[in-house]
Curated annotation (Swiss-Prot):
BIR repeat extents: 24-89, 127-193, 236-300
Residues forming coiled coils: none
Annotated source species: Ostreid herpesvirus 1 (isolate France) (OsHV-1)
Stretches for region Disordered: 83-126
Chain positions of all zinc fingers (RING-type): 315-350
GO molecular function: zinc ion binding
Protein name as it appears in the record: Putative apoptosis inhibitor ORF42
Keywords for this protein: Metal-binding, Repeat, Zinc, Zinc-finger
Length: 364
């Protein structure tokens, strides 16, 4: 169970769940920037992960800090009185006493201040026998559903008590559901908490199974596509159906010679085996291919003027030769190759020159 699941639960239930070490540890699931040992230490010392990127919070005093601030965390563990006092406890503290509500309407917890007991049922007698011949609502609330919630009939009237948390409910109505009333009135009951944990674990397992099935189907489909000859346009298009890149015109990408091999957003050209990664929405696959791998046979028919680089402009430095060199990464096209080798920064934007591509098909 992670933060996303806790967001949909009542706050009283969230507070109760966070008293459990395994629940706090589960809030760190999916956070990749801390070791498992550090996550275990944080959960053991009563911290849990909150929604902010690197933020954790103390379950007792609610102090927030960065998961990376090791010095402050360890100082807080030593200083937080609630954490020090409560650290030896294995179970959350008993729920506070509750006041009896008005007679009638929803079931109400009795005004009791009885500490929670352990998980093992404390009573040896058959709880079902306490209802037989006494439960006044058997026509619309079955005895079995009450027993399943840990209730025993204590009377008078329709009063029942949970064997685990000792909450007492009464004034049942025809539309009441025992499990819902139990969760609403006693969210910290071990039986209720265990049901939440089981439900979340089952949801996680179901999602994991579904994700693995999707990944397996995707892998099988991609392997089928990769087994084909990528010189064929239709096979490249088939592989690009799985590509997570931002360019939606996959046919244009395929016609440029690229196909997808399943690694991040990297594309590979079938003709020159070049690989390009970190694609952006406005990238032109033909232009990127021509600039980065101008010698590719698949780019032989693509002219530099077709991708926005014309040699009609003069070099801005010597003012004699024609501009014929693309500067990377800024892609400005204002220098002849000779002048470009004499400068370290682009004269237009002042960015450092990392690579020079001469449009007369001399790759530098």
């Amino acid at each position: 169970m992670g933060i996303s699941e806790l967001e949909y639960l009542p706050q009283t239930t969230v507070n109760a769940l966070l008293q459990y070490d395994n629940v706090r540890l589960a809030t760190f699931r999916g956070y990749e920037y801390a070791t498992d040992q550090w996550k275990k230490y944080l959960s053991d010392t009563k911290f849990f992960k909150v929604g902010e990127v690197d933020q954790i919070q103390c379950v007792f005093c609610r102090m927030k800090t960065s998961i990376r601030n090791e010095e402050r965390i360890k100082k807080h563990v030593a200083d937080c009185r609630e954490g020090v006092v409560s650290a030896p406890q294995q179970q959350p503290p008993p729920p506070p006493s509750t006041s009896i509500g008005a007679v009638g309407g929803d079931p109400r917890p009795e005004d009791m201040n009885v500490p929670e007991r352990g998980w093992d049922p404390p009573m040896s007698k058959d709880p079902k026998s306490t209802f037989l011949g006494k439960w006044p609502h058997s026509e619309y609330i079955s005895i079995d559903s009450m027993v399943a919630e840990g209730f025993e009939f204590i009377g008078p009237g329709d009063r029942v008590q949970c064997r685990h948390c000792k909450v007492i409910l009464r004034n049942w109505e025809t539309t009441d559901i025992p499990s819902s009333e139990h969760e609403r009135n006693a969210p910290r009951c071990p039986l209720v908490v265990q049901r939440y944990l089981t439900r979340m674990r089952e949801d996680d397992e179901r999602r994991d199974r579904e994700l693995k099935e999707v990944q397996q189907r995707r892998k099988m489909d991609m392997n089928k596509a990769f087994s084909q000859d990528m010189s064929k346009l239709e096979n490249r298009i088939a592989s690009l159906k799985f590509w997570p890149g931002p360019i939606r015109d996959i046919e244009k990408v395929a016609r440029t010679g690229f196909f997808y091999t399943g690694e991040k957003d990297m594309l590979t050209c079938y003709a020159c085996a070049c690989k390009l990664i970190n694609w952006e929405k406005n990238d032109d696959p033909i232009k990127e291919h021509k600039i980065n791998f101008p010698h590719c046979a698949n780019m032989a028919d693509v002219k530099w003027s077709d991708v926005g680089f014309s040699n009609d402009e003069e070099c801005v430095i010597c003012l004699g030769a024609k501009a014929d060199t693309i500067l990377k990464p800024c892609l400005h096209y204002s220098l002849c190759y000779g002048c470009s080798t004499q400068v370290q920064k682009c004269p237009l934007c002042r960015k450092k020159i990392e690579k020079r591509v001469q449009t007369t098909n001399v790759l530098q």
